[in-house]
From Swiss-Prot:
It comes from the Bacteria. GO terms for molecular function: structural constituent of ribosome. InterPro entries: Ribosomal_bL19, Ribosomal_bL19_CS, Ribosomal_bL19_sf, Translation_prot_SH3-like_sf. HAMAP family: Ribosomal_bL19. Signal peptide: none annotated. One of its GO terms (cellular component) is cytosolic large ribosomal subunit. This is Large ribosomal subunit protein bL19.
Length: 124
C-alpha cells in the first residue's frame, strides 16, 4: 500500500510540473483553461463557473464546476491532475457552509448567488 501511495505522489509531481494549481474550495469561482485537440488543431477553451463539489482522491482528485449558459445550467467534472488542463485560475472566493453545493441546481437568479469573501487592504 505504501508503494502505491509513493508511486501516486511521484506521478502527481510529474503532472504538476510547470503548473500551479490554486487552493480552491466549493463556492469559489474558477476559470479552467482546457486544451482541446481536434484533428491536427489544438486550441485553449476557457470554462468559468462555480465549484460545487471537490473530491480529494490523490491522483484521481476531481472537481465539478457549474455555470449558467443561455439560461441553462451546465455542469462539468474535471480531473484535477489531467494533462488536458493547461491552467486553473481562481477568480473569486465564495463563503459557503457546505462541502457539496448540489442544492444550487434547484435555485435560480439571485437565490443561487454565493456571498463573496471580502478582503481588506490590510490583509492582502
Amino acid at each position: 500500500m505504501n508503494l502505491i501511495k509513493q508511486f501516486e505522489q511521484e506521478q502527481i509531481k510529474k503532472l504538476t510540473q510547470g503548473k500551479s494549481i490554486p487552493n480552491f474550495r466549493p463556492g469559489d469561482t474558477v476559470k479552467v483553461n482546457l486544451r482541446i485537440i481536434e484533428g491536427a488543431n489544438e486550441r485553449i477553451q476557457a470554462y468559468q463557473g462555480v465549484v460545487i463539489a471537490r473530491a480529494n482522491r490523490s491522483i484521481s482528485s476531481s472537481f465539478t464546476v457549474r455555470k449558467i449558459s443561455h439560461g441553462q445550467g451546465i455542469e462539468r467534472k474535471f480531473m484535477l491532475y489531467s494533462p488536458l488542463i493547461s491552467s486553473i485560475e481562481l477568480i473569486k472566493q465564495g463563503v459557503v457552509r457546505r462541502a457539496k453545493l448540489y442544492y444550487l441546481r434547484n435555485l435560480q437568479g439571485r437565490k443561487a448567488k454565493i456571498r463573496e469573501k471580502i478582503f481588506s487592504k490590510d490583509n492582502q
